[in-house]
Amino acid sequence: MTQTLSQLENSGAFIERHIGPDAAQQQEMLNAVGAQSLNALTGQIVPKDIQLATPPQVGAPATEYAALAELKAIASRNKRFTSYIGMGYTAVQLPPVILRNMLENPGWYTAYTPYQPEVSQGRLEALLNFQQVTLDLTGLDMASASLLDEATAAAEAMAMAKRVSKLKNANRFFVASDVHPQTLDVVRTRAETFGFEVIVDDAQKVLDHQDVFGVLLQQVGTTGEIHDYTALISELKSRKIVVSVAADIMALVLLTAPGKQGADIVFGSAQRFGVPMGYGGPHAAFFAAKDEYKRSMPGRIIGVSKDAAGNTALRMAMQTREQHIRREKANSNICTSQVLLANIASLYAVYHGPIGLKRIANRIHRLTDILAAGLQQKGLKLRHAHYFDTLCVEVADKAGVLTRAEAAEINLRSDILNAVGITLDETTTRENVMQLFNVLLGDNHGLDIDTLDKDVAHDSRSIQPAMLRDDEILTHPVFNRYHSETEMMRYMHSLERKDLALNQAMIPLGSCTMKLNAAAEMIPITWPEFAELHPFCPPEQAEGYQQMIAQLADWLVKLTGYDAVCMQPNSGAQGEYAGLLAIRHYHESRNEGHRDICLIPASAHGTNPASAHMAGMQVVVVACDKNGNIDLTDLRAKAEQAGDNLSCIMVTYPSTHGVYEETIREVCEVVHQFGGQVYLDGANMNAQVGITSPGFIGADVSHLNLHKTFCIPHGGGGPGMGPIGVKAHLAPFVPGHSVVQIEGMLTRQGAVSAAPFGSASILPISWMYIRMMGAEGLKKASQVAILNANYIASRLQDAFPVLYTGRDGRVAHECILDIRPLKEETGISELDIAKRLIDYGFHAPTMSFPVAGTLMVEPTESESKVELDRFIDAMLAIRAEIDQVKAGVWPLEDNPLVNAPHIQNELVAEWAHPYSREVAVFPAGVADKYWPTVKRLDDVYGDRNLFCSCVPISEYQ
């Protein structure tokens, strides 16, 4: 039969690229699970009353090439002015070797958070390097492996200061008046829910205020002034006040370390180390503290430990501080951080080394000195005598200066009374400085760069002598070896080879949605039209961004059934926080601010109770019944008991137990009956898109993990995006922004992240995914995700019982394998199975969540039947190995499972095990072998002997 032109054009071609199983494979799997079609399977599994009659209208699919061309046209509407706005954001030069070998490399960007350290040693080493950079530059003892952005880090510093403060009755937090405005905005938002009073004043007046538990200072103020706070910090310390200092990472190359001046906490943005501005993000924040406060720090910390053979190995340390373990008692709700961006910054430091970084910092400062000298020579006045890269220039004709700047396609900071701000960066050249002279002085100024350079080279007083760094930085060999591109390329490749990412195998982590991050989706993030915009540039310069964001928001509104979407939250956990704040402020607007009880099912993600605590709510746990569903009797009792104090419920759908609960609408009705709101966690949205929606179900607000459902890669632990969808009554209460007003969202609420649209530069990934899939493809993706999970469950059921199922014995998009009976019978645990899977070439499923002693498997729609069968065969082979232990063929204390994973060194060492080397490293005929570089980690040793900085190179060899 002759095909039509429309068929030959094949606009839906990408759907077949994204979805792993082809039509024949899908039919084979449908036959295996006893379903006639995808629609029939979906109809059996999803409750009838929440199934959409028609898919959301998000348009027809587009080919990769058509979508790229369409988005390129949108991006071209952005105007790439040279921005000297500063305020924590500058242009950068990302070394091409890092661009090509990391940012554009799926071996780096498709990996998951390194909960399984044996398959994560490469990025763990890069993160340890990031921590070493932080330690060297801040002068403190302990550093984290990144936070979401500088403003979030400031809020975390405030919360940490209260945790460690000895002044238990003090409830006021002092913020110096020259911190960045967006930082103050986020601090105020966080302080409100914690019940702290924020005082903003000149830093030198801090001692005038009573009952202060913590202070936030900024080493280089927002308008450029370098502060020597040594004496002030000493006085504050004598009064037991916890001191936090915000610092500029590039300035720290030249300036004295705040830690050496007595600061307790130092933080800032690592954006200047090679990460483009991207209209606000994503960027990693660095965070450091004194050793005595290490167990109160927020976020991931990488530590040096030992493996089972006694070799040096890296792992995430002190995880008992974190939300996935401590829940509402955690130090923060941080789950996703900014690992990929932290690793870019880390490798930027490795590539340039201390000499290169000093050259860059000195060049920036020299050009700033030259600019200052020329302006002063012509009679203009500077507000500050001491500066690093930022000048605050008083101008009589400010309007004229700004007009000339616009004509020259230059952005200056314009929000300072009777002055403009100018921040230089590593991209600034002498030609740029001459342009600035022309803008500020007119064309006939007669200034000469070389003449000015000679003057300032011999007489620069812009950095106080006491503020100049007098110690060496980055002395570890890793920062002094890889400076040729060949060496750098090989070092990065050596790290990549240690890790297991989606470019090698499926990552079947339940509740994580490790789906394809298509190359066509990733390409636009490197376009300069998206990468080079300052987040506070005039809105008319960002029309492309505004169009793309508006279109993406419209699609998400239709897909979620909500009325509005706020793009600001930088992660899923931050989206939870923002959504709960919207609920809180909604209640307050109705004079019901007393509503502060948040109901959370026992099966919830750890971020849920941690976020509720951050939002100032009390957590009350709702029981689950024997089938894993919310116990409606207990829910009604808890809701009735809460009464007028009920704020909301946080519920995940499908549930974290991997089933579509039949009573989800009744759950919503019960909560609404008692005046509460329904927060539907979007973690499992990949099983909803096109089939049902949170709004249709009856929820009021949800966050969306764009790094799960909508294809932003996990990056080894970030970046992520967690925009929130809300019903109309909550729309006025989503986050706002003090610097940039968000068009279409008329809200005066505080910000939750530094930039108005969060990590805006990765939003094109989700735009591309939705555009290429269209309504038809998005629904099919959800259906195939469900099919793949049911195929795995049906084939493994006899070997590993599926703990929870819904109607007809079906699961949703993931399934929980119950290992507890096997452990009781044989002594082999879920941990042993997880580590043995490494020998078979797989990342482990999620361990012991949401039920201890289980493995939760989520295959996503992107894995083909071939890969699913490979995983299933590995699991069945492992079950056969467990039977060998059960039969006594291998002793419990010495078998391939308890000794897993196995490494290459063992092949040439003495072999005393009762199983062969072949069984150890080539089980079940594994051909395309992934080799872990370390054996099983000793977690206890790592936490008892905490060491979180670089170790000698010899330790890795």
UniProtKB/Swiss-Prot annotation:
One of its GO terms (biological process) is glycine decarboxylation via glycine cleavage system. Its EC number is 1.4.4.2. SUPFAM superfamilies: PLP-dependent transferases. The keyword Flavoprotein does not apply. Its cofactor is pyridoxal 5'-phosphate. InterPro entries: GcvP, GDC-P_C, GDC-P_N, GDC_P, PyrdxlP-dep_Trfase, PyrdxlP-dep_Trfase_major, PyrdxlP-dep_Trfase_small. It comes from the Bacteria. Signal peptide: none annotated. It is an enzyme of class 1 (oxidoreductase). It catalyses: N(6)-[(R)-lipoyl]-L-lysyl-[glycine-cleavage complex H protein] + glycine + H(+) = N(6)-[(R)-S(8)-aminomethyldihydrolipoyl]-L-lysyl-[glycine-cleavage complex H protein] + CO2. The keyword Ligase does not apply. GO terms for molecular function: glycine binding; glycine dehydrogenase (decarboxylating) activity; pyridoxal phosphate binding. The modification N6-(pyridoxal phosphate)lysine is found at residue 708. Pfam families: GcvP2_C (PF21478), GDC-P (PF02347). Keywords: Oxidoreductase, Pyridoxal phosphate. One of its GO terms (cellular component) is cytosol. Belongs to the GcvP family. The glycine cleavage system is composed of four proteins: P, T, L and H. The glycine cleavage system catalyzes the degradation of glycine. The P protein binds the alpha-amino group of glycine through its pyridoxal phosphate cofactor; CO(2) is released and the remaining methylamine moiety is then transferred to the lipoamide cofactor of the H protein. This is Glycine dehydrogenase (decarboxylating). It comes from Escherichia coli (strain 55989 / EAEC).
